[in-house]
């Protein structure tokens, strides 16, 4: 799955893990489709890179709602977890690396007050982000929500590769990526930073998410972040599978 350059860098980065993590895969029963095979192959390849990483297929109630998918969780604390439905390759490879490191105990670069704000969020929040491997605006959103899921057991986040779940894309009316839902309702679309997501969450919950001051007041205007063309949501149709991750992107997670 990974070329030699990416594999070498990932192996080095996994040396930053502080605690055991587990990759829990959910695939179709026969696992004959290409993405299921690639999911199992990717998780097995990662597990071979560190003694602190193991992988196994989910059973019974452990199985995710979508297949193929895999859940990254702390071995001793399964409440610290994120899920990828599909393959986080292309532009999302850095999101995969950060998820592995953060769940493995490597500290986030987020400000201390932001981390405390996330940990103090109340209520149950089930986020889903629809992405494509070639989307340049998706990683910021995926990584922000992954961090929130890692830090707060009341928050769950699944990143969904839209091209693999076209029926769901059609049913939900997703027209562009990234699109984020919260508890089954549309939450936002377009590129957003962590601070914007926290402010938006505080806005839609009427302040019950706690600590909006740390992220600043909610932004006025629509949920889609205005900005240069490359910050606008990207259409779902016509997206290719994307190129492999740029190795220089990995510098951001060290």
Descriptions of predicted regions:
Residues 30, 87, 132-135, 163, ...:
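Short, surface-exposed acidic/glycine-rich loop or hinge patches that mediate macromolecular interfaces
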Residues 28, 50-63, 153-168:
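Thiol-based oxidoreductase modules, predominantly thioredoxin-like and allied folds used
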């Amino acid at each position: 799955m990974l070329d030699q350059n990416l594999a070498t860098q990932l192996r080095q980065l996994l040396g930053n893990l502080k605690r055991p993590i587990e990759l829990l895969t959910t695939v179709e029963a026969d696992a004959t489709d290409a993405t299921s095979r690639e999911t199992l192959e990717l998780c097995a390849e990662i597990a071979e890179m560190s003694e602190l990483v193991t992988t196994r297929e989910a059973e019974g109630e452990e199985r995710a709602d979508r297949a193929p998918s895999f859940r990254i969780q702390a071995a001793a604390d399964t409440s610290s977890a994120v899920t990828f439905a599909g393959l986080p390759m292309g532009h999302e490879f850095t999101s995969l690396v950060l998820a592995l490191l953060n769940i493995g105990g490597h500290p986030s670069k987020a400000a201390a007050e932001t981390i405390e704000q996330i940990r103090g969020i109340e209520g149950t929040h089930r986020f889903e982000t629809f992405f494509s491997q070639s989307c340049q605006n998706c990683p910021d959103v995926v990584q922000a929500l992954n961090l929130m899921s890692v830090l707060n057991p009341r928050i769950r986040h699944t990143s969904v590769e839209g091209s693999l779940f076209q029926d769901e894309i059609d049913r939900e009316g997703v027209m562009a990526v990234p699109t984020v839902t919260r508890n089954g309702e549309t939450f936002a679309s377009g590129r957003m930073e962590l601070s914007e997501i926290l402010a938006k969450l505080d806005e839609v919950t009427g302040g019950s998410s706690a600590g909006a001051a740390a992220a600043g007041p909610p932004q006025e205007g629509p949920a889609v972040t205005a900005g240069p063309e490359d910050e606008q949501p990207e259409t779902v149709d016509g997206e290719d599978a994307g190129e492999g991750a740029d190795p220089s992107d990995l510098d951001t997670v060290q």
